[in-house]
């Protein structure tokens, strides 16, 4: 009987703790942070010239030669660009 009470109490504490963690996660929306604080930019977002690691994931590389846009923006990488970024060892995911 004591075991059942302790188990039930533990489950209640675990449920309350997990709800508070989820609330904290919702408060911090990564899209609201500037690029420098996020660590990387999503596709079609501004990036740092010459730094493919400034684009998130293995799919994104920084492109500064877009014919219709001034500046540098993340684009979807081709096969060779993906391999080059993989070997570069970028820390962001």
UniProtKB/Swiss-Prot annotation:
Protein name: U12-lycotoxin-Ls1d
Source organism of the structure: Lycosa singoriensis (Wolf spider)
Tissues expressing this chain: Expressed by the venom gland.
Presence of keyword RNA-binding: no
Main subcellular location of this protein, as a coarse class: secreted
Gene Ontology MF: a single term: toxin activity
A single GO cellular-component term on record: extracellular region
Propeptide: 19-38
Post-translational modification: Contains 5 disulfide bonds.
Keywords linked to the UniProt accession: Disulfide bond, Secreted, Signal, Toxin
Range of residues in the leader sequence: 1-18
Location relative to the cell: Secreted
Family affiliation: Belongs to the neurotoxin 31 family.
């Amino acid at each position: 009987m004591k075991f059942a009470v302790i188990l039930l109490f533990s489950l209640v504490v675990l449920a309350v703790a997990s709800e508070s963690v989820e609330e904290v996660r919702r408060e911090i929306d990564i899209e609201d942070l500037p690029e420098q604080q996020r660590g990387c930019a999503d596709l079609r977002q501004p990036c740092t010239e010459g730094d493919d690691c400034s684009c998130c994931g293995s799919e994104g590389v920084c492109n500064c030669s877009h014919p219709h846009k001034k500046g540098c923006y993340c684009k979807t990488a081709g096969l060779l660009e993906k391999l080059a970024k993989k070997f570069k060892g970028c820390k962001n995911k």
